[in-house]
Curated annotation (Swiss-Prot):
GO terms for molecular function: ATP binding; pantoate-beta-alanine ligase activity. ATP binds at residues 36-43, 152-155, 180, 188-191. This is Pantothenate synthetase. InterPro entries: Pantoate_ligase (IPR003721), Pantoate_ligase_C (IPR042176), Rossmann-like_a/b/a_fold (IPR014729). It comes from Pelagibacter ubique (strain HTCC1062). The gene is panC.
Length: 280
């Protein structure tokens, strides 16, 4: 039997799949916000957007082991369940889903594989990461059947892949919400709590430099590769970071064809052993 742990704000506990279905069957305008906990203002934006557009909102908190290609990252991922539940209660979330690993992975993973053209950006450096993301969200959507799901723009490649996969398989629409940033322009992330003071400050400076680069590329796309090269050299030299990638990609298909097309500047780097990603 498939057991679940669902905490309602009234602290009503639902253990069975059938009970979950009964709880949400009258709420077909259900909005779903998947998270891994350590909630912040970025998650708040997703939740508020869901509440504005859906009758009820369900938030999941599940640190998914299959999307980590580094066991150390999984073990050290920030965990603040007590604070998260208090935060969600203040936001008046209708349902909070807290599954265990066994409850999610009670059956064998689906064979989800990225094609060659999709193995770019984070997929190039984090083997199996997006397959893990797609697998866990596939299970969530199959179980919950939300009308809409909300994701953050900071993880744009993830949003792009999830939207294509989920909308081709289910009746759930996947929506993206704008990135929320710290005062120093660093994108809000649960990983920010792992940064020391110096790394936090430097990451903010890096974000500002990347935003400036994006604006310069808009004015002169022909020389964008050279502009990226010089900034990579500057950042690596002055901020003691290891850059995995810094690339411009078409926002419609993530191709490198950005001439006369809308585009984003994507970055992933390590600073003080903490991996950060962003896009502008």
């Amino acid at each position: 039997m498939f057991y679940l742990l669902i905490f309602l704000l009234q602290m009503k506990l639902i253990k069975l799949k059938t009970d979950l279905i009964k709880a949400i069957e009258l709420d077909r305008r259900l909005g779903f916000v998947p998270t891994m906990g350590s909630l912040h203002e970025g998650h708040k934006t997703l939740i508020k957007t869901s509440q504005k557009n859906c009758k009820k909102t369900l938030v999941s908190i599940f640190i998914n082991p299959t999307q980590f290609n580094n066991k150390k990252d999984y073990k050290t991922y920030p965990k603040n369940l007590k604070q998260d539940l208090s935060y969600l209660k203040k936001l008046k979330v209708d349902y909070v889903y807290l599954p265990t690993i066994k409850q999610i992975y009670w059956k064998k993973n689906n064979e989800i594989k990225l094609n060659k053209s999709q193995k770019i950006l984070c997929a190039k450096f984090r083997k199996g990461h997006f397959e893990g993301v797609l697998n866990v969200l596939d299970r969530f959507i199959e179980l919950i059947s939300p009308q809409k799901m909300f994701m953050g723009e900071k993880d744009f490649q993830q949003f792009f892949l999830v939207k294509n996969y989920i909308e081709n398989k289910y009746n759930t629409k996947v929506h993206v919400c704008k990135t929320v940033r710290e005062k120093n322009k660093l994108a809000l992330s649960s990983r920010n709590s792992l940064l020391n003071k110096k790394s936090f400050i430097n990451s903010g400076i890096i974000a500002k430099k990347l935003l400036s680069l994006k604006n310069e590329i808009k004015k002169n796309k022909k020389n964008y590769k050279k502009m990226i090269f010089y900034l990579k050299e500057e950042l690596s030299k002055n901020f003691d970071i290891k850059i995995e990638y810094l690339e411009c990609r078409n926002t419609h298909n993530l191709s490198t064809n950005i001439m006369n097309k809308p585009f984003k500047l994507f970055v992933a780097y390590y600073i003080n052993n903490v991996r950060l990603i962003d896009n502008f």
